[in-house]
Each structure stands twice: as structure tokens, then as C-alpha cells.
Amino acid sequence: MQYRHTFHVHAPLAVVSDFHAHSASMGAITPPPVIAQIHQAPVRLQEGDEMDFTLWLGPLPIRWVARIEHVGLNGFTDRQLRGPFRRWVHRHSFRPINETTTAVIDEIEAELHRHLFWAVVGLGMWLNMPLLFAYRGWKTRSLLEKSSAQPEFSSAKLKDNP
């Protein structure tokens, strides 16, 4: 299965890249009622880092471990090591449109688990991808466009803007 979503944010490439490099950005752009509980992750994501987190879908905890790969100014990839899919590779790409606008492109390749329970959970998650990424685009724009004059984001600032 493949999914692609693109949106533009009125913020420079460096600001968009820096925002996504903070592990706290995941929780900041996760739509309610889903809760992203991060168990272990560095403050700033770098090549080879792992994120261990739980996505709470109501009362259902979905534990996930992802490795961060191909990190650079223009994006990074998170690859599921353990989680609800048999295979999940998510490429986050950032492309400058001009000095003040950046395209954010999410490309996901996934395979459902063979186990019936996890296949149903994964399929439910997959079918909600358009809603998830519409929210993420809106929230990213909301956070970055009001703060794009600020050259750097901190985890504290991200936590202050749930």
C-alpha cells in the first residue's frame, strides 16, 4: 500500500526542517482523540535514532518503535521496527518553493500484518490517513506560520502548543 500527502507551509525550509527534527513535534501534530505517548526518543532526531512510543486510539494502545534514517535538511525517513504494520516506511520530505514557503511531502509504503487482529487495526489506521494528514498539515501550518520569524524551535515551545 502507498500513500502520499503534500501541503505548503509559509515558513522557510530551515524552520520546517528544524520543527520536524524535534521528537516532540510528533505529539504536537497528532490529532485528537489520538494521544501520542513517547516512551523513549532523543530531543532532536538524528541518523540511527529510535523512537519508542504508544499511539492511544481511545482505550487501544498501539506500541510502535521506529528507526530514523536518511536525515538531512530536506527530510528524513522513519522505518517501523515494531508496530501495527508488517512493514511501514514513512519518508518526510521538505522542498523549498521559495525563501518563505516550503512543501511538506509525506510518502508512506506499508504492508498489513498477517495476524487478523493487527490486520484490522492497521487497515483502520490506513483508512484514516487522509484525516490524519489533513490535520497534520493544518496543525503544522498553524504552529509554523505564526512563528516563522523565529529561527529555532525548542521542545518546550512544542509542548506549549498541543
Q: Language model features by range: what are they?
A:
Residues 9-11, 57-59, 70, 110-114:
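Beta-strand elements of well-folded, non-transmembrane domains
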Residues 37-83, 138-142, 147-148:
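Glycine-rich portal/gate segments that line the openings of hydrophobic small-molecule binding cavities
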Residues 111-158, 162:
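A conserved amphipathic terminal alpha-helix motif
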